Amino acid sequence: MKRIFSIFLSGIIMAGSVLCVSAQNDVDKKYDSYRESVGSEQATDTVELTPTSNNGKSYEFDIDVPSGNYNIFLNYTVKAVRTDTIKYILKINGECPFAECKNLSAPISYVEESRTFPKDTGGNEISGNLIVSNNAVSAPVCDSEGIFKGNYSFFLGDTSRKLTVEVTDGDIILSSVTLKPAREIPEYAEYSKNNKGKQEGGVIKLNAEHPDNRTSKSIFTFCDASGASVQPVAEDKIVMNALGGSQWRRVGESAEWKIDVPKSGLYELRIKYMQGYTNGRGVSRSFYIDGEVPFKEALNIYFPYSSKWKEMTFSNEKGAYAFYLEKGEHTVTLAVSLGDLSEIIKDCKTVLSELNTVYRRIITLTGVTPDSYRDYQLEDKIPEVIEAIGKEAQRLDAIVERLNKSQKGGTESGVLRRLSRQLKKFNDDPDKIAPQLTQFQSNIS
């Protein structure tokens, strides 16, 4: 029996992530298409590049590396905080390799001004002040919306000469970028096989109220006085003993803790949490060790709904996950993730992209302000578009069914159902398209 590596976060209060779907410009190549076009040649070397020029907002780096697929990491310090996150554009040879590179983001790291909570005149603890960390941050280039799980992989070859990072929002000093061979995250079965035979570890217990850094001030510390199960116990005075709350919900927001591992070995991970904000639905978090996801399943750790404090061991249907940790200092991180919503949102974006194409085809005949009483003969002139409308209605129905099965339907599934009904009306009677075109355009924009 493996020993337990316990993070007793004296509670983590979980909240769900926001389901937000919008269409992207389908003229640009998306990341999936980019990956299919560049192949899977693996890079072998880790390379750090320093800027050859910068004006405080745009940084250029000369690329001279062996051909292969790389993960890119930005190494920076924050000068001043004007926004919640750093926004930037990434280009290779003066062009964004795929559409998502036009809207990338990097986190701002916050730390406690003091590791001791201040107290009021009555001896009650007060949540401490958070300040921007002076430490350098190393952030991977990844999907800030959380739809693609893991870091983006970039192919750099003989024709790759220049990498440009344009900071569009935020005030940072970008000292370097690191190119690492693109990592293929293993399944747990492979990860476990590679660690087979390694000895069991000890017990590590850690309270949650003092994360070593967090990427949002929304991840705040507070007092839970519901009982003795949360440590330290709040009896006759207010004690800061819990972290998180209803505002810890934006995709990517994370909290990180340092741990001192007394001996190398296999550890289980147990967390005490409460998650009572999402009307019976569970939520998901991604789990990192030393900034890396140990195996694919850790990208989507599911926390079932629980309005009371509950201990949960990270596990699958076969039992608890066993994490291998070397002796010494490590970091463990929990970050908000979409979980199984990521594929649903990805499919929604595909449908909306197709419907925007449908809209553009229609207005070539009707114009943007069609005459509601005119017969545009759409069924005769663009029958393939009418057929596409029917197919997209079916795809929306399938998405709604998946949302409902995952218990994450809510208002989002209602919006999709209304759009599906409108599409079915258009498919059954194309004469209704022109009078309702403005509403249709609004629904898909």
What are these regions (language model features)?
Residues 2-3, 20-23:
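Intrinsically disordered, polybasic Lys/Arg-rich low-complexity tracts
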